[in-house]
Amino acid sequence: MSGGAHEYVAAYVNGENNRLIIYGKALINGETKTKNVYEKASRDYYEDNYNANSSKYGDAVYEVSKSGGYYSSWYGDYSHFPDFYGYFFERGSGYSRGAYAGVLAFHYSSGGSTNGYSFCPVLAVL
């Protein structure tokens, strides 16, 4: 089951990037209970950021992957933990991304809008 849409989720790495402020202002200023905020590692690289947040469970990053990068999610789905390239989380991915797409795929995004991106609303009782 690969392809569909790139889906943004309410999660980001708390890094230093103008795009985080430009595209994520509402998310950053939103209530803590409505988002997952990951800390940036001292070396802002996908594997380091992944390891720095390894105790954070509940949003299907660590539950379905064995490392922060390159086809390490279950069933060989692509993974690239957000880093200096982009601090926003993207899930799934569009059919045009080929091997990058997958139900359990996750990777970074700079946060801008483009064709094929969507947001998957989820209602959770808190």
Regions found by a protein language model. Give the residues of each.
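A short, polar/charged loop-to-alpha-helix boundary motif
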Residues: 15-25
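C-terminal, surface-exposed recognition/capping segments
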Residues: 4-14, 27-126
